[in-house]
Amino acid sequence: MISVLGLDLGRKRIGVAGCDRLGQLATGITTIYRRNFASDVAQLRRICQERGVEKLIVGLPYTLDGQLGSQARQVQHLAEKIGAALNLPVEYIDERLTSFQAEEILKQRRRSPRHHKDLVDQIAAALILQQWLDARSQTAKATLAAGDPQL
């Protein structure tokens, strides 16, 4: 399993998530409060070096009808710049409603999403990464079931 980092890119914060060595469980790592691009990249570089990250998984906020809206294009642009600065490939996954799901998780834990926006971003990043891990796992299982000798 390659080491990946899940990112929920926002205007004010970046939620960051990682996964276990088996690539089965995603967890929130931290929230980066954005100041400027150089500072954001420096913080991400430190995390990537510590974890031996080989790929970035970024949530794209498609519109509810599945289109790439202006927000998704902004996220894509920023993700490409970050990937280039870190010399890492970027892969995208649909992140529709992950922030809503993250807020619901916090409410279940009796924490206010309004007062814990940093946790919302971390949980959203973990949901994004978990979605990617699950999709990858399903693809691997389907390939094994088909008897593909490549896997």
UniProtKB/Swiss-Prot annotation:
- EC code: 3.1.-.-
Compartment(s): Cytoplasm
Which InterPro entries does the protein's record reference?
Answer: RNaseH-like_sf, YqgF, YqgF/RNaseH-like_dom, YqgF/RNaseH-like_dom_sf
Q: Which UniProt keywords apply?
A: Cytoplasm, Hydrolase, Nuclease, Ribosome biogenesis
Q: Which GO terms describe its cellular component?
A: cytosol
What's an example of a GO molecular-function annotation for this chain? Answer: nuclease activity
Biological process annotations from GO: rRNA 5'-end processing
Q: Which domain of life is it from?
A: Bacteria
Indicate where this protein is primarily found: cytoplasm
UniProt keyword annotation of Nuclease present? yes
Q: Does the keyword Hydrolase apply?
A: yes
Q: Which SUPFAM superfamilies match?
A: Ribonuclease H-like
The record's PANTHER family line, in alphabetical order, gives: POLYNUCLEOTIDYL TRANSFERASE, RIBONUCLEASE H-LIKE SUPERFAMILY PROTEIN
The function of this protein is: Could be a nuclease involved in processing of the 5'-end of pre-16S rRNA.
* Sequence similarity: Belongs to the YqgF nuclease family.
This chain belongs to the protein called Putative pre-16S rRNA nuclease
